[in-house]
A protein has these predicted regions:
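Helix-loop-helix hairpins and the membrane-proximal interhelical loops
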Residues: 1-49, 56-73
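Intrinsically disordered, low-complexity non-transmembrane regions of multi-pass membrane transporters
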Residues: 1-9, 123, 184-185, 230-231
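Alpha-helical transmembrane segments and their helix-entry boundary regions
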Residues: 40-43, 54, 69-70, 97-101, ...
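Juxtamembrane membrane-interface segments at transmembrane alpha-helix termini
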Residues: 52-59, 81-88, 174-180, 206-207, ...
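A cytosolic-side transmembrane-helix exit/cap motif
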Residues: 60-64, 89-97, 116-123, 180-188, ...
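Helix-loop-helix junctions within the multi-pass membrane cores of secondary transporters/permeases
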Residues: 71-163
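Membrane-embedded alpha-helical modules
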Residues: 126-216, 223, 227
Length: 231
């Protein structure tokens, strides 16, 4: 079978790109009173993190110090270290620069698309991953810039429900992956792992921040998966 390349990666990321445009518009509209389209564009190019950018806008709105903004972004994006670490195992024989560029543009959604592709093939072409990442990256950039530009024209953007787009996209990706995983992993094992992640997340919320709770709950879920595989 012919190995999938850059444009197949772009095609695989189309659902993610559509979701990014929608939530990017929402982010831009919400941020329009506090940042210009140019500033939002630079934020999207160099930060490129939906939840972190929403947090940045909220902190900018209350004139929080730069150190507080930087620390918040770091904690929110901490989980991406874990995702990049795992994704890099699929590109062991790829050059360092390929891995750096792929990890720099990796998000929850592009990682999810990669995991879906891994179900169908044992080897993923690095160019496929670049296509997956770049389509999502450009879509997010365009969505946020256009949203900021149009922000002043929409006095009540909440009525469009754009803030739910990211949640809907996550649900769609998870549902698709869960259906695929059922064919390879016993349902009992899947529910045990999901239960560990869910329970540990809510327990951890009582002692650490939400970002750290996500990270630690994910690690506990991975640990449980390893334990179950060893049985």
């Amino acid at each position: 079978m012919k190995e999938k390349g850059f444009w197949e990666g772009v095609q695989a990321a189309v659902p993610t790109a559509l979701g990014y445009i929608s939530i990017g518009l929402a982010c831009g509209i919400i941020g329009s009173p506090y940042v210009t389209p140019v500033e939002m564009g630079l934020m999207s190019l160099f930060v490129y993190a939906g939840s972190a950018q929403f947090a940045m806008i909220a902190l900018i709105a209350v004139q929080a110090p730069v150190a507080a903004i930087a620390m918040t972004v770091f904690l929110i994006n901490l989980r991406l270290f874990l995702l990049s670490l795992h994704a890099s195992t699929y590109f062991r024989h790829t050059s360092l620069w390929h891995n750096i560029s792929m990890s720099s543009l990796l998000t929850d959604e592009t990682y999810g698309v990669l995991m879906g592709e891994r179900v169908h093939t044992d080897k993923v072409n690095p160019m496929w991953m670049h296509g997956n990442n770049l389509n999502s990256y450009i879509s997010w950039f365009l969505g946020t810039v256009v949203g900021t530009t149009l922000g002043g024209l929409l006095p009540n953007p909440e009525v469009f429900g754009l803030d739910f787009a990211l949640v809907g996209m996550f649900i769609g990706i998870f549902t698709s992956q869960f259906q695929i995983m059922q064919k390879r992993i016993p349902l009992r094992k899947l529910f045990i792992i999901l239960g560990v992640v869910a329970v540990s997340f809510f327990v951890l919320l009582t002692v650490v921040s939400q970002s750290l709770a996500v990270l630690f709950a994910t690690l506990l879920g991975c640990t449980m998966g390893v334990i179950l595989d060893g049985q």
